[in-house]
C-alpha cells in the first residue's frame, strides 16, 4: 500500500468513527431529553452541578488513555454545555 492509499484508508476509518461518535451523542441527547422530562415532572432542576462534577471525575478515572485527564474533562464540559444548549 502506498502513502496515498494509507492516508485514504486512515481517513476513511476516521470518518467511520466520526459517524459513530455522532450517533452516540445523538442517542445520549435523547436520553437526557427523557431525563429532563422526568426532572420537570418531579419539580427537580435540570442541571445538577454536583452530579456533573462527579460524572466527569468518574469518566476521568475510567479513561484508559491516550486522552489525558484534562482532555477528558474538557470533552465532558463541552458535551454538557452542548446538551444544555440543545435542550434549553
Task: List the predicted regions and their residue ranges.
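Domain-level signature for soluble enzymes in the chorismate/prephenate branch of the shikimate pathway
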Residues: 1-88
Amino acid at each position: 500500500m502506498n502513502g496515498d492509499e494509507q492516508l485514504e484508508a486512515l481517513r476513511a476509518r476516521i470518518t467511520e468513527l466520526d459517524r459513530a461518535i455522532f450517533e452516540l451523542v445523538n442517542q445520549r441527547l435523547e436520553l437526557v431529553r427523557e431525563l429532563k422530562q422526568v426532572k420537570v415532572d418531579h419539580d427537580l432542576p435540570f442541571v445538577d452541578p454536583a452530579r456533573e462534577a462527579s460524572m466527569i471525575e468518574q469518566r476521568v478515572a475510567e479513561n484508559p488513555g491516550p486522552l489525558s485527564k484534562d482532555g477528558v474533562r474538557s470533552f465532558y464540559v463541552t458535551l454538557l454545555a452542548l446538551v444544555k444548549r440543545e435542550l434549553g
